[in-house]
UniProtKB/Swiss-Prot annotation:
It holds the Pfam family NAD_binding_8. It catalyses: UDP-alpha-D-galactose = UDP-alpha-D-galactofuranose. It comes from the Bacteria. Involved in the conversion of UDP-GalP into UDP-GalF through a 2-keto intermediate. The lineage of its organism: Bacteria, Bacillati, Mycoplasmatota, Mycoplasmoidales, Mycoplasmoidaceae. This is UDP-galactopyranose mutase. The gene is glf. The keyword Glycosyltransferase does not apply.
């Protein structure tokens, strides 16, 4: 069911009365929306300003006008969490479908392999040697042990080394180098180790999740429910210079603002890139419609060995909507270096957390901390990759801080 947005959409910044709200939130992504919901429920008047023409940030989804299929404009978002506080918060807004994530691999040998790599994948890949290796794992490790690639490399067993060489050469290294645009040795180890090798017959992509899936009505409709409070006003299509840092003060719409400001945008941009630009990876999407019920075996298929594309995503398999329709929508993702003026790569998706960038970010963080009414929240403002459940939890904590 669609929810009507019961918030005021200002036509221009001149309509905004700086005295008409208690707290300003810059950014209508998941972090800002969750925060606004909690604050409004505590009788705070909240103004959200957003430069895009829609709410939801990168979680935004919409219905394709030609096929009537729901898709994610900025790539797939699968919700998962093991945090009860987050579960309690989303319960009135998210009714999750029963989707459990699994990622297919498209490799040269055309084997039906998936991630995470588990015993079933080892059998398919290595045959008799695979059965020997699984026996070795069962004798020497506890069932359901999750091994990182680095841990697999250290196992003194020739078949384990054979598996390691296959994974490093065909999966982890080519995918990561393409994704991050860096030599493999320079890529953050935490990034490489996000997907483990699971010592069990079956495995889950999100093994710690208590709940996982996608909202049955879509993320956008779920966010509209969160914003359905008369104390929340939203302004879309904003100029991105409404909030300005000048002379160690913040100005909103050319007026000095001393009320709390929660900023969810690029932290380096807020401070006019005074220390330099933080680096991000971006994505370019190629969208295709197919006149068939199903395009690929798995909802998400990683392509480590393809020249430029990292993965393809078939959205009807994620949303569980339109399975009967003889059409489907698939996106193909190509990563590149973020640059604001690049027509393909002008959206900052993934912070490149290395020594250089993290040192630069700390300078901006220190500068921001001197502004007593400024609060940084979300992926761009805190320069870190944040899963949706963590974004929600951080917004809950920020609300508690602002209300205390």
């Amino acid at each position: 069911m669609n929810v009507i947005l019961s918030v005021m959409l200002f036509s221009s910044p001149s309509c905004v009365n700086i005295n008409s709200f208690d707290i300003l939130i810059v950014g209508a992504g998941i972090s800002g929306i969750v925060l606004a919901n909690i604050l409004a429920n505590h009788n705070k008047r909240v103004l959200i300003v957003e430069k895009r023409d829609h709410i939801g940030g990168n979680c935004y989804d919409k219905v394709d006008s030609k096929t009537q299929l729901l898709f994610h404009q900025y790539g797939p978002h699968i919700f998962h969490t093991n945090n009860q506080t987050v579960i309690n918060f989303i319960s009135p807004f998210f009714e999750l479908n029963n989707y459990h994530h699994r990622v297919g691999l498209k490799l040269k040998n055309n084997l039906d392999l998936t991630l995470p790599f588990d015993f079933q994948q080892i059998y398919k890949l290595m045959g008799k040697d695979g059965r020997k290796l699984v026996s070795f794992f069962k004798e020497n490790f506890s069932l359901n042990t999750h091994l990182s690639l680095a841990e697999l490399q250290l196992i003194d067993n020739p078949l384990a080394q054979k598996l390691y060489q296959f994974l490093i050469s065909n999966v982890y290294k080519p995918y990561s180098v393409k994704m991050w645009g860096l030599p493999f040795a320079m890529i953050n180890e935490n990034v490489i180790n996000r997907v483990k090798i699971v010592l069990s017959e079956q495995s889950s992509y999100f093994p710690d999740a208590i709940i996982q899936g996608l909202p049955k009505s879509g993320y956008t409709n779920s966010f509209l429910k969160m914003l359905a409070n008369p104390l929340i006003d939203v302004q879309l299509n904003c100029k991105d210079n409404l909030l300005v840092y000048q002379d160690e003060k913040l100005f909103f719409n050319n007026n000095l603002i001393e009320k709390p400001v929660v900023y969810c945008g690029l932290i380096d941009k807020l401070f006019n890139f005074c220390f330099g630009h933080l680096q991000y990876r971006s994505l370019a999407f190629s969208w295709k419609r197919f006149n068939q019920k199903k395009y690929q075996t798995y909802p998400v298929v990683n392509m480590p060995l393809a020249k430029s594309i990292t993965r393809s995503v078939e959205y009807k398999q994620l949303t569980n909507q339109g399975s009967f329709k003889p059409q489907t929508i698939v996106s193909f993702e190509t990563p590149g270096s973020y640059a604001i003026n690049d027509p393909r790569f002008n959206e900052p998706y993934y912070p490149i957390n290395n020594t250089l960038n993290d040192t630069l970010f700390k300078k901006y963080w220190k500068k921001a901390s001197k502004l007593k009414n400024l609060h940084l929240l979300g992926r761009l403002a805190t320069y870190q990759y944040i899963d949706m459940d963590k974004a929600i939890l951080l917004s809950i904590k920020k609300a508690q801080q602002l209300l205390s």
